Amino acid sequence: MPRVKRGNVARKRRKKILKLAKGFRGSHSKLFRTANQQVMKALRNAYRDRRKKKRDFRRLWIVRVNAAARLNGLSYSKLTHQLKKANIEINRKMLAELAVVDPQAFAQVVEVAKSA
């Protein structure tokens, strides 16, 4: 069986890693071994943080809705309970957007929830 030297395959693999490491500082973008470590770390962090992003935004929306609800005399938990009782199905993202962009409309939603 003929010998396989893998020159092209190895070069292609290393070029791919160095291309992914473009923009990293110093040897992290120049030397294959350190670049490979940094690319692996970056991909791991990106994978983790794509999931964390969803949690972070939900927390942000809840904080914003809670702050706006307290200005209108309700806590966040009471507001969500009242909204559920009033059959108002506005998600946290939309409530937070209303609270920031249009506080009067948010106040009206709170009043409807209070009356339920």
From Swiss-Prot:
InterPro entries: Ribosomal_bL20, RIBOSOMAL_L20_CS, Ribosomal_protein_bL20_C. CDD domains: Ribosomal_L20. Keywords: Ribonucleoprotein, Ribosomal protein, RNA-binding, rRNA-binding. It comes from the Bacteria. One of its GO terms (molecular function) is structural constituent of ribosome. One of its GO terms (biological process) is ribosomal large subunit assembly. One of its GO terms (cellular component) is ribosome. Binds directly to 23S ribosomal RNA and is necessary for the in vitro assembly process of the 50S ribosomal subunit. It is not involved in the protein synthesizing functions of that subunit. PANTHER family: 39S RIBOSOMAL PROTEIN L20 (PTHR10986). Belongs to the bacterial ribosomal protein bL20 family. This is Large ribosomal subunit protein bL20.
